[in-house]
A protein has these predicted regions:
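A short, N-terminal "cap"/entry segment at the start of jelly-roll beta-barrel domains
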Residues: 1-49, 56-61
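Short, surface-exposed secondary-structure edge patches
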Residues: 68, 106-109
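Short glycine/proline-enriched turns and hinge-like loops at secondary-structure junctions
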Residues: 61-62, 128-131
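Conserved metal-binding segment of the jelly-roll/cupin
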Residues: 108-128, 139
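A generic structural signal for short beta-strands and their flanking turns/coil linkers
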Residues: 41-45, 64-66, 76, 133
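Short acidic (Asp/Glu) patches
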Residues: 48-62, 93-104, 119-122
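A short hydrophobic beta-strand segment most commonly corresponding to one strand
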Residues: 68, 130-148
Length: 148
């Protein structure tokens, strides 16, 4: 998992590739995105603004997509680990691009203005004590060059 301390830092790196630039463009328009609706730019990128106040019991992992979480308001703890260090609880489902795992990972706290990038070789779970607002972008992994 990579944590970027500001939207500006993300945008500085994003110009290197079209899909990362698309993510940066979404950051610029995040306040205009209606929460609770998932938008799509083909199969390569989908996004939504969500309010989150739940704590995940299990780790979630993806294979086809890299997830980018842009924190617009509030703070949230994230526990993450390499999938190889976790135990699979529910098998991977192609139709949802999700697999569920359990175990222990490292915990970090992120806040408004920070961005996390969850690679598809990792799994994560969110620990929430208060409402957060974030832009969540899923970018197809096979077409990406690592951002930072």
């Amino acid at each position: 998992m990579r944590i970027l301390d500001s939207f500006e830092l993300f945008q500085q790196h994003a110009h290197t590739q079209h899909r990362w630039q698309s993510c940066a463009d979404l950051l610029d328009s995040a306040r205009d995105i209606t929460p609770g609706i998932v938008y799509s730019r083909g199969d390569a990128l989908n996004y939504d603004v969500r309010f989150d106040s739940t704590t995940d019991a299990l780790f979630t992992g993806h294979r086809r997509y890299v997830e980018v979480h842009c924190f617009l308001h509030g703070t949230q703890k994230i526990e993450y680990a390499a999938k190889a260090q976790l135990q699979q609880v529910d098998c991977y489902r192609e139709e949802t691009d999700r697999e569920y795992l359990r175990g222990l990972g490292q915990t970090v706290q992120v806040q408004e203005g920070q961005i996390i990038i969850c690679d598809n070789n990792e799994a994560y779970r969110f620990i929430t004590h208060a409402m957060v607002k974030k832009l969540v972008i899923k970018v197809m992994a096979n077409a990406l060059v690592q951002l930072v």
